[in-house]
């Protein structure tokens, strides 16, 4: 796997304009929708239990994000996820804050037990807590802890029968057999809320058009990281507000050529 190979997935997303069904959190809904539109995908935010199964059945991908967790949304996620499974729609799960509270951890473990996942995406602490491995966590954005990230990712992929994506200073993608590290991105991403949540939805757009989910995830992460680097180069001295606007611009303007030129991936 190389940057030339994965760069083609970006063009495919823009040509296909996939419908990405998001059941996400209230903090990031607008940013997620705008980010997907900028990329070239079609976002829909449908949460009502009366319609989620139908909406999920016609989507290119379904993204479940438990950032602002409520029982009615959990019910909707389960309905949507099972419909997606029945209709061969890939499901992505972002277990935001898993480990922060007992209820949040319970839900983070229940959803993968009930729904077949194409991708699980989180920081190291979240993924570790989903598979009941000890890792430090403080709040929903924590990811710093003691442990081997690659080992946790492989364990999650094996136990959950999915592609595990752990993001941080370096990103890891694995299906338990193939493992790739991506070294793109910028630290200013941590100063804008919702960049991780948007990333999961962007991976959803890539998964909708590329059925090799490892390749799709690596392509999405590399694209996202390169876009962040290009945006930061223009705005980092101004601050996160300017960066957020330019980042949306770069999600629209970053090309497959940029990925070939700036992408940093390593198969391990």
From Swiss-Prot:
Belongs to the Thz kinase family. It catalyses: 5-(2-hydroxyethyl)-4-methylthiazole + ATP = 4-methyl-5-(2-phosphooxyethyl)-thiazole + ADP + H(+). Substrate binds at residues 45, 194. GO terms for molecular function: ATP binding; hydroxyethylthiazole kinase activity; magnesium ion binding. It comes from the Bacteria. This is Hydroxyethylthiazole kinase. One of its GO terms (biological process) is thiamine diphosphate biosynthetic process. HAMAP family: Thz_kinase (MF_00228). The lineage of its organism: Bacteria, Bacillati, Bacillota, Bacilli, Bacillales. SUPFAM superfamilies: Ribokinase-like.
